[in-house]
UniProtKB/Swiss-Prot annotation:
One of its GO terms (biological process) is translation. It comes from the Eukaryota. GO terms for cellular component: chloroplast; small ribosomal subunit. One of its GO terms (molecular function) is rRNA binding. InterPro entries: Ribosomal_uS7, Ribosomal_uS7_bac/org-type, Ribosomal_uS7_CS, Ribosomal_uS7_dom, Ribosomal_uS7_dom_sf. This is Small ribosomal subunit protein uS7cz/uS7cy. Keywords: Chloroplast, Plastid, Ribonucleoprotein, Ribosomal protein, RNA-binding, rRNA-binding. Part of the 30S ribosomal subunit. It is found in: Plastid, Chloroplast. It comes from Nymphaea alba. Belongs to the universal ribosomal protein uS7 family.
Amino acid sequence: MSRRGTAEEKTAKSDPIYRNRLVNMLVNRILKHGKKSLAYQIIYRAVKKIQQKTETNPLSVLRQAIRGVTPNIAVKARRVGGSTHQVPIEIGSTQGKALAIRWLLGASRKRPGRNMAFKLSSELVDAARGSGDAIRKKEETHRMAEANRAFAHFR
């Protein structure tokens, strides 16, 4: 028997201003080269822009955008008998949120625009309304999973 104790699960920290875990997840994904203060600046500017654009609570817009982009199912490449199949798998809530944040940031980086705060705010507002590249990515993933439903038993 092992003498080691069980490791405690780490809880996701929340950001200092909004005390929100989603904002913290977003900050950690937008982070480049360890510049966390710059990441916070970008997020807070984006939140201000969302407030100006929609005149509603920006955190509810963020939650709605992430809920809209979060996938329920994804495809995973699995090698069976020499050929690779795209096998649909269900995704948990944490992994789904992480994917949604990654897609939102990827879509906002691709957008034409002035700065990252502007692009991120535009993408979040679009995602909350049900349009934008991140939503398209989710729908594409769901289509792939639906098309490869025949391989679901390879899990």
